[in-house]
């Protein structure tokens, strides 16, 4: 009986083990066809962005905080390389457009930041929500979309190595 419990415990630990940042998993399902407002107040239709090429959609808890800044700047620093491969990048958080604009301008981010104060995009991507007092925050996550399909997802996304993770996955999915 003890042996069965130990084996069952080991099996469950393996199956339910926590993901480490940057590992993610290969998947294949339709990408959410949502829309949101960017830092300039313009509506961004995600399905239209997906048609332009591979798309990285990353979620971060709060604009202009240390971990979120590392994640966003990692993608900023690799943006020229990613763009050569036709990759589009969208960042999403619960922040309002004015906070997204300040974050984008402060760190010269070359891609749109989408305001999702009601959490509709967060919900569509099944990103975990965290509560900090009265604030709702999106758990750091990242998705790679190709041809309208999510092909990779990472619900434990890296901060400063986000771009490296994306480049690795892009190379594996060519």
What are the roles of these predicted feature ranges?
Residues 69-108:
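Structural microenvironment flanking redox-active thiols in thiol-disulfide oxidoreductases
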Residues 1-7:
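Bacterial N-terminal signal peptides that target proteins for export
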Residues 90, 104-139:
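Short, internal strand/loop/helix patches
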Residues 7-15:
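Bacterial N-terminal signal peptides
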Residues 46-69:
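Short active-site neighborhood of thiol/selenol oxidoreductases, capturing the structured segment around
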Residues 137-174:
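Thiol-/selenol-based redox modules, centered on thioredoxin-like
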Residues 20-47:
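N-terminal "domain-start" segment that seeds a small globular fold
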């Amino acid at each position: 009986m003890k042996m069965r419990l130990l084996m069952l415990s080991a099996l469950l630990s393996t199956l339910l083990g926590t993901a480490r940042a940057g590992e993610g998993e290969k998947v294949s399902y339709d990408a959410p066809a949502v829309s949101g407002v960017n830092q300039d107040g313009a509506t961004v239709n995600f399905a239209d962005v997906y048609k332009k090429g591979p798309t990285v959609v990353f979620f971060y808890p709060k604009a202009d905080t240390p971990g979120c800044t590392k994640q966003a700047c990692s993608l900023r620093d690799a943006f020229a390389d990613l763009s050569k491969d036709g990759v589009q990048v969208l960042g999403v958080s619960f922040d309002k457009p004015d906070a997204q604009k300040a974050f984008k301008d402060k760190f010269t981010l070359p891609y749109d930041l989408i305001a999702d104060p009601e959490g509709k995009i967060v919900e569509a991507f099944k990103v975990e929500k965290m509560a900090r007092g009265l604030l709702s925050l999106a758990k750091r996550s990242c998705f790679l979309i190709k041809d309208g399909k999510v092909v990779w997802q990472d619900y434990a996304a890296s901060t400063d190595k986000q771009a490296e993770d994306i480049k690795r996955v892009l190379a594996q999915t060519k």
